[in-house]
């Protein structure tokens, strides 16, 4: 793992998971909140799912709104914007395999951050929401550890 800090912070990061409906939009929103003034971020999935209301609720608890996020696949993102990223952070095995396939034709780095799937949690609403909070908090910790402190306002 690279040392955290400005010198190792990529200019453009793509977070990817299976459906682009929970983990990758949460990670992208967290990254954007911390580094959006200095780095571009987006998210994609292997397939396109539906935005998960528990993910929206977990992010709202910390003041981040992902309610307008629209899940998108790698292919759709490439068709719309191109895949001009320095780094793809994959959060699920299928996304990791897809990102590694991209390295055959695109110059990008790929990091795999195994991240639990909170959608498989059982229990009442609060118990299920707790699993989304845990994923959110794990992603925030990992982003801070990997990319360093958020830049000062005057950077």
Predicted regions and their residues:
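Short polar/charged helix/loop
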Residues: 1-155
